[in-house]
Amino acid sequence: MSLSQEIVSLVKEAETVLSSATTEQELDALKNQFLGKKGKLTSVLKGLASLTVEEKKTVGKEANEAQTKLEQFVEAKRTILKESFYENQLGKESFDTLRPLPKKERGSLHPISQIQYEIEDIFTSMGFSVMDGPEVETDENNFGALNFTEDHPARDMQDTFYTVDGNLLRTHTSAIQVRALRKLKPPFRIIAPGRVFRYEEVDASHENTFYQVEGMVVGENISVAHLIYTMETLLSRVFRKEIKTRLRPGYFPFVEPGFELDINCLVCSGDGCSVCKQSGWLELLPCGLVHPNVLEAAGLDSKKWTGFAFGLGLDRLVMMRYGIHDIRYFQSGNLRFLKQF
């Protein structure tokens, strides 16, 4: 039998044997018997050494074609085995396409973020723009341009976090007022929500890291009446009811006159608790008319332009909204607390 005949016979034998494989592992083992380094086709091709050059070309081509044909046969058989395996698996297993997926843990916005976005929506509906500013500020923007004197106690290192280069962590979002006055042309209305830092003793109603929403309106003939109306509108929309408030004198260097707008404590309904320090009232909104010195420092004519400003304690507002007794929960990272919102 010539080598060509042996190759043809080997291909027929291989196809018969490979067809009998019932698994991919068995198929690979049988493939090695015929096409491996020590397989039957390799053994047959050892006879090429005794052939002439022309015969070698002919038989070599036939051998390559035989190898290609068998490899294609193996892959076709492999596809059949895979399809058969999957069909068997589907026959054994049931799959309910209507069954709900396993419940997955979902995240949510922090309660402070939720109320911040709600407040932004309220103010933008009233014609305000939302501004932002850096948390690391210059002493000038945080104090100087806001009419704080050089010896003001707020500038003391016991009240403010200073950086090594002389800057500081902003103690109030009022610093954004300065940027707004320099950047915008009056009349304008802006709010500026953000995180602030103070070197304070932490307790149920005080934190060293907390959030404020600064607000400022600059225009002509702005009065205290505009300020009170804006604040009461905000509070009634946030709490979805009329809120009892009181306005009392307060001193802040960047406003004149200055006020403290307090709300009746919603945690204890005014009876007195640790949040309101047994007073029944909670300090929520330091506010007032923008001090002429602040306007002049920004290059505005204080005889033409007036305005009001306020600094809303966002953490305390959230505490009132949800009846939370301790401000420290907000920074705790306690998921049991946060998942309630």
Swiss-Prot record:
Look up the EC number in the record and give it.
6.1.1.20
Q: How is the cofactor bound?
A: Binds 2 magnesium ions per tetramer.
Group of enzyme by EC = ligase
GO molecular function per UniProt: ATP binding; magnesium ion binding; phenylalanine-tRNA ligase activity; tRNA binding
GO term, biological process aspect, one: phenylalanyl-tRNA aminoacylation
User: Do the record's keywords include Protein biosynthesis?
Assistant: yes
GO cellular component terms, alphabetically, are: cytoplasm
Q: What superkingdom does the record give?
A: Bacteria
Q: Which UniProt keywords apply?
A: Aminoacyl-tRNA synthetase, ATP-binding, Cytoplasm, Ligase, Magnesium, Metal-binding, Nucleotide-binding, Protein biosynthesis
Its subcellular locations are: Cytoplasm
Q: Which residues bind Mg(2+)?
A: 256
Signal peptide position in this chain? none
Cofactor(s) needed: Mg(2+)
Cited InterPro entries: aa-tRNA-synth_II, aa-tRNA-synth_II/BPL/LPL, Phe-tRNA-synth_IIc_asu, Phe-tRNA_ligase_II_N, Phe_tRNA_ligase_alpha1_bac, Phenylalanyl-tRNA_Synthase, tRNA-bd_arm
Q: Which reaction does it catalyse?
A: tRNA(Phe) + L-phenylalanine + ATP = L-phenylalanyl-tRNA(Phe) + AMP + diphosphate + H(+)
Task: Write out the similarity annotation.
Answer: Belongs to the class-II aminoacyl-tRNA synthetase family. Phe-tRNA synthetase alpha subunit type 1 subfamily.
What HAMAP family does this protein's entry cite?
Answer: Phe_tRNA_synth_alpha1
- What quaternary arrangement does the UniProt entry report? Tetramer of two alpha and two beta subunits.
Q: What is this protein called?
A: Phenylalanine--tRNA ligase alpha subunit
What lineage is this protein's organism placed in?
Answer: Bacteria, Pseudomonadati, Spirochaetota, Spirochaetia, Leptospirales
- What's the gene? pheS
